[in-house]
């Protein structure tokens, strides 16, 4: 932290579908690049260890096990990095598959945050493979170590909340005319179809976006 600020980096690694070892190598490489640039929080895309588009391969035990092996490898090979790191992978828990963000710090796997809102429309069909993490809470064992599913922690004066989600109501947002956006006629109150939904989103503090890990 410098002058009360920390540098947060969002990274998009080059990935290959179902090639967890290659993807982990790219993730590790980018972590060291971001470290050199002073980043203290590093956020990677969901399912970056396996790639998002594995389709029915998500049901293959070999893929799920290799994803965990590479998660441990990422943690071990970045244990000297002074940063909080989030990566995504599929994780089986109690017979169900979850799309989770794993938190890493100094070689430790801190815990997992399962995705809650699963998009299931158009080209998205996550509900075919994954279970919503809305009510899951427990302990996951990887490489004989126990890790908490759902994780909250304070780092000195900084508190982190992690959410992986998509929110269908955002599809109801009004389209904004490019010519008006930011112009003199632009009114941010018109971003929503009605004030009721606007108020609901603020009150519930659920500003979440599809296919994104937030800190």
Model-predicted regions and their roles:
Residues 160, 164-202:
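Long, acidic low-complexity intrinsically disordered regions
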